[in-house]
Amino acid sequence: VATPGAEPMAFGGYAAALLLDADKMLRFDSLRAPEAALRRWLNAAALVRPAALEGTVVTTASPSPVEQALVRWDPAWFAREELEERAQTGLPPAVRTAAVTGAEADVRAFMEEFLGSSALPERVREQLRIVGPVPLDQGYFAWSESLEEDSEEAPVQGDWRTLMFFSYGIAQQVTRELRATRATIAALKKNVGERPVQIRCDGLDVL
């Protein structure tokens, strides 16, 4: 019995593996939940000896594209399907993202400064898709904990977040202005909260 990521090795491979609570990994409200679940399942299944040597993997997962990718042992197929779907819906990695996180007042002030900057061309501003600011809920923190990725800059309870989606074509201008806005706010000491707002581009755990 082992938790995901802590499976011990067995010389010659295990005779069998039972992937318990498989559906639980898919219930997280995150864009990355399916790919994270598949990665963990494949890592565990890879410790089992080949089927030609009577190795067996049993999963409790309900039928789904993720489960099919495991059964077919074809993560490349799953990745292609997922990428095509995200391209159609305008989600990363088909587009780039920027997350502004911190105290509500600081996030709102940052976005006002950013969008009001004369250095940000109107055509770029019009192409931004902005969601928020909204408070980070318990589901987000549960998902972050499941990733077991510690960070000193990790959001804390009570933080708010604004997400921006933008094409690769305008990414350089957007990220340059994000840096400039952060520098301006820091110089003017406009932060209300104890910490400055956190800006992350293309963060893997923000969706």
Where are these regions (language model features)?
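Accessory helical-bundle/CTD segments and flexible terminal tails appended to RecA-like ATPase motors
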Residues: V1-P34, N43-L207
